[in-house]
Amino acid sequence: MAKVIGIDLGTTNSCLAISENGQTKVIENAEGARTTPSVIAYLDGGEILVGAPAKRQAVTNAKNTIYAAKRLIGHKFEDKEVQRDIESMPFEIIKANNGDAWVKAQGKELSPPQISAEVLRKMKEAAEAYLGEKVTEAVITVPAYFNDSQRQATKDAGRIAGLDVKRIINEPTAAALAFGMDKGDNKDRKVAVYDLGGGTFDISIIEIANLDGDKQFEVLATNGDTFLGGEDFDQRLIDYIIDEFKKEQGIDLKQDVMALQRLKEAAEKAKIELSSGQQTEINLPYITMDATGPKHLAMKITRAKFESLVEDLIARSIEPCRTALKDAGLSTGDIDDVILVGGQSRMPKVQEAVKAFFGKEPRKDVNPDEAVAVGAAIQGEVLSGGRSDVLLLDVTPLSLGIETMGGVMTKLIQKNTTIPTKASQVFSTAEDNQSAVTIHVLQGERERASANKSLGQFNLGDIAPAPRGMPQIEVTFDIDANGILHVSAKDKGTGKAANITIQGSSGLSEEEIERMVKDAEANAEEDKKLTELVASRNQAEALIHSVKKSLADYGDKLDAAEKEKIEAALKEAEEAVKGDDKTAIDAKAEALGTASQKLGEMVYAQAQAEAQAGESEQANASAKKDDDVVDADFEEVKDDKK
């Protein structure tokens, strides 16, 4: 059976793994490294360098050295994220004929799938060198929050590289697979996979269940940001260095392509060093020059300074965690393990933020650079028939539907629905003798069609003349295991059908997604606040009742000052529950809880003292009995009669 390799196609670095006979191995590339920089260089003579060799020559060939191409995949040139990247990238990003964001290098116009294919080809060659046989099939991972066109573009990249992509799987799911299969126990567990990579962020809540020796990995919910990652952290540091240098020297390094490339390398190195040290120094001699001569850059960066520069980026990663937990119907206390994936998750401040949110230390036994590729390789072995003890149940990240009469979106598939899935619904015409209908496919959470993301549209014609509402048009949405959407429409009267596979549409920005969800939830927010207020009030009243009872039973055992303190806290809590301020109720209940805790300790101490007194009486009674017992003296007698 042909081997199906697992590839983590990352924004900054990529990784390759193979699973055979239940054993998974990360494969080194031609340079002997376990990860490959996702950097591609186009040279004058037509030669293409990939990985470390491309990265090494980037300073002298900045305009033709492409990195972070994954950030452009499936995006339109006009997208604001692409426009933001244009300002900071040393290479040229152009608008393709179809409106997509492409790259220009050595005079050639290149699509992001084309560029990514070079990295995949290098992975393929490394696998073939290791196995000693031809490799044609692969499982490739993508961010969980990638949309249909981004997934399709990733499959296209595989095809360009000569690979039949058997499955596209989500990066957090792959990491959970690697983690779950590595655990020898059969314990059911819920894990949160926090995946902060080079260019994208995902959070997935996954349940790992043991089913008669087999393991089922079910994604309960997923969320994320396709434009948040280590590249953004690097950029914050680069911008800071540029600003400081401009203040000192009056020269803007943004205008110098070669200086930008040197700054990028220095910033990435400094960021990594600050994960283990408290301070690092950036030294870039001859960074630029003016009429007075060459200029040198020397700057000390502390960990605290770097953390302050990226504080908001870290905070941006926490909100999707909150949403994913809510969508999964869980609280932080329900999570058994927190797994960190992606190189940027090594940053201590990131780990602190994750620990603070989930209330538990993230696992340190998962390799953040390799776990995703390992999971992809395990899925590859499953697909090749090499193992059958694993079942993956992934989800679609956003709701999908069509525009119907009145400009509303009718959802056929809800967000976080397990895939593959299929849903059909019968619609009809809006006017008498209508001969054609336009099926407008949408993605999002809003009721109003125009407020959602348009994924594409197609027409179904030759509908037999009939009064409005009579024709029966069945629309079917089919999402395959790769998360790619296929839509079809069929006139049940004539059997006429039309269909579309969603591809080539631009990606969704995090802001668009957040706005869709927030707008849809706006009405539900007030109800939620009321429910939370009632819950807080009930908890506070239960505590008030409990403390009052304890005071009545044990108040005489407290000193006056302690009793007065508790009574004051009681009075404040009773006043708070009369109002509608949830924060005040919670605060006063907490204060009362602290005061009543001391009361509880005294009650416990009193009960313990009484118990000890009882034991002491028993001991005395026992000793009195012992006074009546006569101790016998024994003498050793030697028996000589043998």
Curated annotation (Swiss-Prot):
Show the ranges annotated as biased composition (Acidic residues). Answer: 628-642
> What do we know about what induces or represses this protein's expression?
By stress conditions e.g. heat shock.
Against InterPro entries, the record matches this protein to: ATPase_NBD (IPR043129), Chaperone_DnaK (IPR012725), Heat_shock_70_CS (IPR018181), HSP70_C_sf (IPR029048), HSP70_peptide-bd_sf (IPR029047), Hsp_70_fam (IPR013126)
Which residues are reported to carry the modification Phosphothreonine?
Answer: T200
PROSITE patterns from the entry?
A: HSP70_1, HSP70_2, HSP70_3
Q: Give the molecular function GO annotations.
A: ATP binding; ATP-dependent protein folding chaperone; unfolded protein binding
> What are the entry keywords?
ATP-binding, Chaperone, Nucleotide-binding, Phosphoprotein, Stress response
Q: Region (Disordered): which ranges? A: 608-642
Q: Where is the composition biased (Low complexity)?
A: 608-622
Record-linked HAMAP family: DnaK
Q: What does this protein do?
A: Acts as a chaperone.
> In which family does this protein belong, per the annotation?
Belongs to the heat shock protein 70 family.
What is the protein name for this chain? Chaperone protein DnaK
Q: Which species?
A: Neisseria meningitidis serogroup C (strain 053442)
Top-level taxonomy: Bacteria, Pseudomonadati, Pseudomonadota, Betaproteobacteria, Neisseriales
